[in-house]
Structure formats: C-alpha cells, structure tokens
Amino acid sequence: MSNETKQPEQGEEYLVPVERYMAAAVRLGARVSNNYLQERGFIFSVRPDGLRIFNLKRIDERIRIAARMITRYPPSRVMVHSTKPYAFKPIQMFCKFVGCLPVTGRLIPGTLTNPYLTHHIDIDLLMVADPKTDFQAINEASLTGIPVIALVDTDSDPTFIDLMIPCNNKGRNSLALVFWLLARQVLRERGELKPNEDLPVSWEEFRVPVGQSRS
C-alpha cells in the first residue's frame, strides 16, 4: 500500500493541522483489521511493522458527521460511556462542555433496558469509546433501539454500531484529541462557538495524566 506519509493533500483543510493528528497518533490502528473497515476506505495503509494506518480524511469526516448527529438530540438525552480508564477524563471533559451524560466505569446490567431498576437511564443516543470493552452498553442500546456512535479501531466489531469514528481508541493522546475535536465541533454546529473558534481549553486538558492505568 501507499506510504503513510503521502496521504494528506496539499492545502486540504482538516479540523486541526495534520501534524497534530499525527503527533497524537490518532491514525495508528491495530495489527489486525476486518474487511468491513477496509472495504469502506477507513484503512489507508499498513506499516512495515504490521500496524494499520487509518485514512485521515475519513477520521476528520466522521468527527464532523458525529457532531452533527449529536446536535440532533437534547444533550441530557445523550449518554457517553466507556469502561476504559484512558477514556474517563476525555468523556468527562466532553460532557462538561457539551452537556451530555457521562457514564464511566462498569455499566450495571439493565441500565438501558430495565425501567424498573433504580439505576435505569433513559436516553436517545449512546456514544462509546471502544466496542470491544463497551459491548454491554452497545448490546443494551441495540435491544431498545438506541442509535450508537462508536470510536472504532481497525479490529473493532461493527455490529450494532450506527456511526463509526475510525481512530486510535486506545492511546491517551488520541482519545483526548478526538473528544476535544468532537466537543468543539458540536458547539460550532450549535452556534455556541464561531466556525473558527476554539474551546477555552487546549486538547491536552482532555488528557488523562501520565501514570493512570490504561487497562
């Protein structure tokens, strides 16, 4: 496949400079990929060490599409979830700015499906950081007809996912930048930020501190 450094076209406009995407390793995938993602143009190349490289243009496009999708729902009816510690702070910061419901850590079975439970949550849209670790929430959403947005790696299972955002969903830098971009783009779509206006905090503020578990 093509060399990974040749993808960005001169003058092409992205949500952030290409160098920032690369520095945060947003394009790095796993050493395994599935045909579903390959056929849809999400995977751009394979490095000599076997790591898949995501198509940067598709990442950028999907962040924009996801932001538009999120704005269709009342913020309080959108749940953002992950069991991955590296996603906790990005999710909490995203929800702080956007007004969505952050649910981090283990999801108690029945949270989305059993209205008789005291911990039941009634939502219209679910977003998760990793289909592999957040499968409980995805399965419950599928049973109740709740659409799902998910950050997907090259080896992620697309089952029950309505909108995929291809990206490195394991790294602390990548998760921070993607959720920062999503928050900024949602606020731009709502008109709460001007088209070229940034959040009042840098993307680094969305990042989990060094030393926190990544399991």
Curated annotation (Swiss-Prot):
Keywords, A to Z, come to:
Ribonucleoprotein, Ribosomal protein
Q: By its UniProt entry, which InterPro entries does this protein fall under? A: Ribosomal_uS2, Ribosomal_uS2_arc, Ribosomal_uS2_euk/arc, Ribosomal_uS2_flav_dom_sf
Instruction: Cite the GO molecular-function annotations of the record.
Output: structural constituent of ribosome
**Which Pfam family is an annotated match for this chain, by its short name?**
Ribosomal_S2
The GO biological-process annotations, alphabetized, read as: translation
Q: Where are the transmembrane segments?
A: none
* Superkingdom as given in the UniProt entry: Archaea
Can you quote a single GO CC term? small ribosomal subunit
Q: Which HAMAP family match?
A: Ribosomal_uS2_A
Protein family per UniProt: Belongs to the universal ribosomal protein uS2 family.
Q: Which PANTHER family match?
A: 40S RIBOSOMAL PROTEIN SA
Question: What protein is this chain from?
Answer: Small ribosomal subunit protein uS2
UniProt source species:
Caldivirga maquilingensis (strain ATCC 700844 / DSM 13496 / JCM 10307 / IC-167)
Q: Which gene encodes it?
A: rps2
